[in-house]
Swiss-Prot record:
Gene3D superfamilies associated with the record: Heme oxygenase-like
One Pfam match: TENA_THI-4
Entry's Gene Ontology BP terms: pyrroloquinoline quinone biosynthetic process; sulfur compound metabolic process
Protein name: Pyrroloquinoline-quinone synthase
Function: Ring cyclization and eight-electron oxidation of 3a-(2-amino-2-carboxyethyl)-4,5-dioxo-4,5,6,7,8,9-hexahydroquinoline-7,9-dicarboxylic-acid to PQQ.
Top-rank taxon: Bacteria
Length: 255
């Protein structure tokens, strides 16, 4: 195992490339995603992914609100608030959370089941909660730049649009609206996120820390799929050696 560190200050172009190079660790390369995009996933595996990723979706606005709460710059907040509106919706746009619920219905899940979060695995909950808590506790620039996995997001959304309709004809096509919407939104968000990162990371320490923060976010996305792989591929859900029931803790412990 090697840990690559440098004592050299990157130019803005070099630093941007270093950030983009992290794409080799994006969860599009996880075996679970490869399985889904290659058409080898079962209905249960698709449903499990949608139900668990819903927990990620509903927490993104909380993450973004935490960033805004720590940010003293009005101009940045005016731009950043659009991310919350993208997910929560406004006026005639129902938002990404509603679009994800419709994806859930398109793959055969009951809306109430998704909203109950009873299918959310502990490992997924822990990973997502770690991300939100980081956004609450880190300085706003670092928390904002943890979102730079959006650099790689358009490719993963496009891959689903390109492959899923063929591989999974049983999925209602209306469910793909979320992926189509995120294609343009992610590109817009990347421009702002990169601008912040290149402005803030003007020392070796800041650049290296930001690369580590981006890796932290990549670790979260990968870990989410590791948990799903245990439950839905290896059929080793939590406590599988003693029960087939979903006995793990549910939402609302602190609410």
């Amino acid at each position: 195992m090697r840990f690559n560190m440098t004592t050299t200050l990157f130019s803005p172009a070099e630093f941007e490339q270093a950030l983009r190079d992290k794409g080799r660790y994006y969860h599009i390369h996880h075996p679970y995603h490869i399985m889904m995009n290659d058409g080898h996933a079962t209905k249960q595996q698709i449903q499990g992914w949608v139900a668990n990723r819903f927990y990620y979706q509903v927490n993104i606005p909380l993450k973004d609100a935490a960033i805004m709460a720590n940010c003293p710059d009005p101009a940045t907040r005016r731009k950043w608030v659009q991310r919350i509106l993208d997910h929560d919706g406004q006026h005639d746009d129902h938002g990404g959370i509603e679009a994800w619920l419709r994806l859930g219905e398109a793959v055969g899940l009951d809306r109430e089941t998704i909203l109950s979060q009873k299918m959310v695995l502990p490992s997924v909950r822990f990973a997502v909660d770690a991300y939100v808590n980081f956004a609450r506790r880190a300085c706003w620039q670092e928390a904002a730049c943890s979102s730079l996995t959006e650099l790689f997001a358009p490719a993963i959304h496009q891959s689903r649009l390109d492959t899923w309709p063929t591989h999974y004809p049983w999925i209602d096509a209306e469910g793909y609206a979320y992926f189509r919407g995120r294609l343009s939104q992610a590109n817009r968000d990347v421009e702002h996120g990169l601008e912040l990162a290149l402005e803030y990371c003007n020392t070796v320490d800041r650049q290296q820390r930001m690369l580590n923060i981006l890796q932290f976010k990549l670790d979260i996305l990968w870990t989410i799929l590791d948990g799903m792989s245990m439950a839905y591929v290896l059929e080793r859900a939590p406590y599988h050696t003693v029960t087939q029931e979903a006995v793990w803790h549910q939402k609302g412990l602190l609410g």
